[in-house]
Amino acid sequence: MIVGLHAVLFTDDPVATRAFLQDTLGLEPVDAGGGWLIFAGPPAELAAHPAEGQPHHEVYLMCDDIHATVADLEAKGAEFVGSVVEQRWGLLTKLRLPGGGELPLYEPRHPSPLTS
C-alpha cells in the first residue's frame, strides 16, 4: 500500500537548500542521520501527463493565493525567477533555490483531489 510521496531536490548546496526549506518555506525536518534532513511536506497529489520529448518528472509547490504567498516568501528572503504568469491550469511562478535550480510554485485553477 502506498503511504506517501517522497521527492528529492538535488542541489549544489544542500546546507543552504535545507535552511531555505526550513527557515523560508517553514517545512519541519526530521534528522535522518548522516547529515540528511527529511522535511514533512503538505498533502500531495500526483498527475500523469503526456510527455513532450523525453519522459521526465517535475515537482511543484501549490498555494491557495499566489500573490500573498510570493509576498510572504519575499519578505523571508526568497527570490523568484520572473513574475506570476497565467497558465490554463493556474497561476505560476518559480522560486530560485539557493543550491541552484528552480522550484515552481502555483495556485491551481483545476479540480484537485485534495479539495474535492
Model-assigned labels for residue ranges:
Residues 27-57, 95, 102-109:
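Conserved short beta-strand elements that form part of the metal-binding/catalytic scaffold
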Residues 25-32, 79-83:
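Short secondary-structure junctions
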